[in-house]
């Protein structure tokens, strides 16, 4: 949803009801909990399955469901809020404006009350005694939230009841509603107890997860799959830039850059900038929501006389929590990266211009700095450093007040790389976006550039840590393993990049000094040659940790790894993870061109199968990164990666049209056979990295010997006019990359209606109103350019007809008079 999603897994060792809503027994003793944690996954599965078959006396009184709190309304006639339907209608309006902020929590039902529990701390947030719940209702398929549980509660101290709305995904709202209603009925003293039967019905209705496979879950790939081999070679920039060797091939590359290449680079940078602005806006909204909740909580505490927690204060307390420090750090890094991109794009973007966006960014930057209590946290964010162009651009653009804020953030925001000690390790910045988007890979080759080299350094810097993890995994591979993946994921490192000046340079350089002995047991070349396989999900599966993937019934999934009982698959959104193979049906491979394309970074450069360690007088060894530079290798002709389509122009920041050549060209493919490694010998992870470094360097060196052209991609352009239908408007909005809220809100208008809206009206309808207005302005200008010449010709034709008619009436053709007009 649009709230902060917790990755904390309920697991089988705690309360089984936390996953699929089955009843759990009262809290165990310490000894019981320790014994339960040691119980095998298969036994726990059998225990869960037996809940539905047990006698009435064995059904527990406590059930728990993971839900998302959507909002709470006060039922007041003055606000036209009387029924649940009124609340759903207002929820739709908030959702259309992007103002619904969800909060994950556990809803617990027992024989006395309905409680809301914090997922992380397990503290009770709210407690609604059953006698205070006046109405319980399930609302399905009413809006984008398709399974809503509505609770109307009124405590004796309240003058008006509250309407609480929850989204229920894991267990549907109608089942939870039946559980609550049966508990309310039983609490009123009915002769026949309804709740045991209701819990039994829930257990039968919820499919749960399939029986566990007998074999252990497959060991997930480590860093090699998180950051592919191609992107890992990017770490070269960190050392080559220090040695002054990076700028030479880059300068030559820029001289050889064609208009098509330049357009692709600009479009890529603009897309990255747009996603940075979106993430910053989302974070600011999150801060504002927390501030609003804190303000409301403070008002309630001041107005009430007793210290007893009032209704709704528990949820408010949870919503008033500020984001964790890591999210603040990520936001500061995106500010710095955004400034760098604006400096690069200052002569390529308009409406708004780069200068306007700089002023725009300083306002939320000031808010975030104040929210952290001062510039201390921001000044500790070292990576990414601002470039010299960025510093010059900010000095020229920033106002006095903005410059004061900028300078207060310290050296990490002011000094460029050349001003830092050469031995100071500056961790490369790898942007991570909230929606999982990754920048598209450019469809041409050239010398390594900063954009191409983000992700490698992260992988290489963590290579030593990965080697230790792999060794640890191998030592325990044949020991007793759970039939399910562990609740906290697999044994690979998901640690983020190092930041700040605290990173030890010696540790950072250590992966370059030693080659791990462990060899990676994965043949990626063989995998790449196999046709893609697809499977359809037979029913829903809910992921319990970050390594698994939640799927819905009838989802079509691409099979990435089917060598074990748990298969690694990728869904239509590009998310990948592990699911049990017994919930999947193998499908016939779709026809060519059907199905989704690979994510941009899943394409890897073809590996040169050269034997690393080849030494000769005319082929010196490839340079290894710091501390000691090495001779430059003789260029080897590289293979050409698969072309990737040029990304479309982003929606919210437009760029000036640059002239480009339509002449087709061809990539000169140089081929050469290399010595291959023995088949029975697999390269270690570090050897693969070094091979890719060697190959990437040869790509940059051989650029001077080759001139190539990239053929212009024929991308269909979607435009709208005043005569466009609502369907055409909707297609145009989707082609510009607007989110579903914007598409659904504006997709009902025709072209004339859409063009008639101003910026304020668009902002009131959808959160991306300003971006839509910019695109509409571009469309209007294009229409004026295309229609201007035809309108002029029409005017001249009518004028000539009048002149001809007047001349024929007088018997004289007055050409001079006509020309004077």
Curated annotation (Swiss-Prot):
Query: Residues annotated as region Helix bundle 2?
Result: 751-756
A Gene Ontology MF term for this entry?
A: actin binding
Cross-referenced SMART domains: PTB, SH3
Residue ranges, annotated region (Effector region) = 648-821
Domain of life the protein comes from: Eukaryota
Query: According to its UniProt record, how is this protein modified after translation?
Result: Ubiquitinated by the SCF(FBXW5) E3 ubiquitin-protein ligase complex during G2 phase, leading to its transient degradation and subsequent cell shape changes required to allow mitotic progression. Reappears at the midzone of dividing cells.
The segment annotated Amphipathic helix runs over 679-697
The record's keywords, sorted A to Z, are: Actin-binding, Cell membrane, Cell projection, Cytoplasm, Membrane, Phosphoprotein, SH3 domain, Synapse, Synaptosome, Ubl conjugation
- GO BP, sorted A to Z: actin crosslink formation; actin cytoskeleton organization; actin filament bundle assembly; actin polymerization-dependent cell motility; adult locomotory behavior; barbed-end actin filament capping; behavioral response to ethanol; cellular response to leukemia inhibitory factor
The record's GO CC annotations read: brush border; cell cortex; cytosol; glutamatergic synapse; growth cone; NMDA selective glutamate receptor complex; postsynaptic density; ruffle membrane
Quick one: where's region Disordered? 1-39, 204-224, 295-320, 461-525, 610-683, 800-821
Per the database record, which ranges form the PTB domain?
Answer: 64-194
Where is it localised? Cytoplasm, Cell cortex; Cell projection, Ruffle membrane; Cell projection, Growth cone; Cell projection, Stereocilium
Tell me the domain comment.
The effector region is required for activating the Rac-specific guanine nucleotide exchange factor (GEF) activity. It mediates both barbed-end actin capping and actin bundling activities. The capping activity is mediated by an amphipathic helix that binds within the hydrophobic pocket at the barbed ends of actin blocking further addition of actin monomers, while the bundling activity is mediated by a compact 4 helix bundle, which contacts 3 actin subunits along the filament. The SH3 domain mediates interaction with SHB.
Role of this protein = Signaling adapter that controls various cellular protrusions by regulating actin cytoskeleton dynamics and architecture. Depending on its association with other signal transducers, can regulate different processes. Together with SOS1 and ABI1, forms a trimeric complex that participates in transduction of signals from Ras to Rac by activating the Rac-specific guanine nucleotide exchange factor (GEF) activity. Acts as a direct regulator of actin dynamics by binding actin filaments and has both barbed-end actin filament capping and actin bundling activities depending on the context.
Q: Which family does it belong to?
A: Belongs to the EPS8 family.
**Full protein name:** Epidermal growth factor receptor kinase substrate 8
Q: Which organism is it from?
A: Mus musculus (Mouse)
């Amino acid at each position: 949803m649009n709230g902060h999603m917790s990755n904390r897994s309920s697991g089988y060792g705690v309360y089984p009801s936390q996953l699929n809503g089955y009843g759990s027994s009262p809290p165990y003793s310490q000894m019981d909990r320790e014994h339960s944690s040691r119980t095998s996954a298969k036994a726990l599965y059998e225990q869960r399955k037996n809940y539905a078959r047990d006698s009435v006396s064995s059904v527990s009184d406590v059930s728990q469901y993971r839900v998302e709190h959507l909002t709470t309304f006060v039922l007041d006639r003055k606000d036209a809020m009387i029924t649940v339907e009124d609340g759903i209608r207002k929820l739709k309006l908030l959702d259309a404006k992007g103002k619904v902020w969800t909060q994950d929590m556990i809803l617990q039902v027992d024989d006395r009350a309905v409680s809301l529990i914090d997922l992380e701390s397990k503290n009770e947030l709210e407690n609604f005694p059953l006698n205070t719940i006046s109405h319980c209702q399930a609302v399905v398929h009413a809006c984008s939230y398709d399974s809503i549980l509505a609770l109307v509660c009124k405590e004796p101290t309240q003058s008006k009841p509250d309407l609480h709305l929850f989204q229920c995904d894991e267990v549907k709202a109608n089942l939870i509603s039946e559980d609550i209603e049966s508990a309310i009925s039983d609490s009123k003293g009915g002769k026949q107890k309804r709740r045991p039967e209701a819990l039994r019905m829930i257990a039968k209705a919820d499919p749960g997860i399939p029986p566990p496979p007998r074999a252990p879950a497959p060991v997930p790939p480590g860093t090699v799959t998180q950051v592919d081999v191609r992107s890992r070679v990017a770490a070269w920039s960190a050392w080559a830039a220090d040695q002054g060797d990076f700028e030479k091939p880059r300068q030559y590359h820029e001289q050889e850059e064609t208009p098509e290449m330049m357009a692709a680079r600009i479009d890529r940078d603009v897309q990255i900038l747009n996603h940075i602005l979106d993430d910053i806006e989302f974070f600011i909204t999150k801060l504002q929501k927390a501030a609003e909740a804190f303000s409301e909580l403070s008002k309630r505490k001041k107005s009430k006389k007793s210290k007893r927690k009032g209704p709704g204060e528990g949820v408010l307390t949870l919503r008033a929590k500020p984001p964790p420090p890591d999210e603040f750090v990520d936001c500061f890094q995106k500010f710095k990266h955004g400034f760098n991109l604006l400096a690069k794009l200052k002569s390529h973007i308009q409406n708004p211009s780069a200068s306007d966006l700089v002023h725009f960014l300083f306002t939320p930057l000031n808010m975030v700095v104040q929210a952290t209590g001062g510039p201390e946290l921001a000044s500790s964010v070292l990576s990414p450093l601002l470039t010299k162009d960025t510093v010059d651009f900010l000095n020229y653009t920033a106002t006095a007040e903005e410059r004061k804020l900028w300078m207060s953030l310290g050296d990490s925001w002011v000094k460029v790389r050349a001003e830092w000690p050469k031995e100071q390790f500056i961790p490369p910045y790898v942007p991570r976006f909230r929606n999982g988007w990754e920048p598209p890979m450019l469809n041409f080759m050239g010398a390594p550039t900063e954009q191409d080299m983000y992700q490698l350094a992260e992988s290489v810097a963590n290579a030593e840590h990965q080697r230790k993890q792999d060794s640890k995994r191998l030592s325990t591979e044949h020991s007793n393993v759970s039939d399910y993946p562990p609740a906290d994921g697999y044994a690979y490192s998901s640690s983020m990049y190092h930041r700040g000046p605290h990173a030890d340079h010696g540790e950072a350089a250590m992966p370059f000094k030693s080659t791990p002995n462990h060899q990676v047991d994965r043949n990626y070349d063989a995998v790449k040659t196999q046709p893609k396989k697809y499977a359809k999900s037979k029913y829903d599966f809910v992921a319990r940790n970050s390594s698994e993937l939640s799927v819905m019934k009838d989802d079509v999934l691409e099979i990435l790894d089917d060598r074990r009982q748990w298969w690694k698959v990728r869904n239509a959104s590009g998310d990948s993870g592990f699911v049990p193979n017994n919930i999947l049906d193998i499908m016939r491979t779709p026809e060519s061109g059907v199905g989704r394309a690979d994510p941009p970074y899943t394409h890897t450069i073809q590996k040169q199968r050269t034997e690393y360690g080849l030494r000769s007088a005319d082929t010196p060894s490839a340079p290894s990164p710091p501390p000691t530079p090495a001779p430059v290798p003789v260029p080897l002709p590289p293979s050409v990666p698969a072309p990737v389509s040029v990304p479309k122009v982003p929606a919210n920041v437009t760029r000036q049209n640059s002239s480009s050549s339509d002449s087709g060209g061809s990539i000169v493919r140089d081929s050469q056979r290399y010595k291959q490694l023995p088949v029975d010998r697999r390269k270690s992870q570090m050897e693969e990295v070094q091979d890719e470094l060697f190959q990437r360097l040869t790509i940059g060196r051989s650029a001077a010997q080759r001139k190539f052209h990239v053929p212009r991609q024929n991308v269909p352009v979607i435009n709208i006019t005043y005569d466009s239908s609502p369907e055409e408007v909707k297609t145009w909005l989707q082609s510009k990359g607007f989110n579903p809220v914007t598409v659904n809100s504006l997709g009902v208008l025709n072209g004339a209606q859409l063009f008639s809206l101003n910026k304020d009206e668009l902002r009131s309808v959808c959160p991306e109103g300003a971006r839509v207005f910019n695109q509409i302005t571009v469309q209007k200008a294009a229409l004026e350019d295309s229609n201007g010449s035809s309108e002029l010709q029409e005017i001249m034709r009518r004028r000539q007809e009048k002149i001809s008619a007047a001349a024929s009436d007088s018997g004289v053709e007055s050409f001079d008079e006509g020309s004077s007009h």
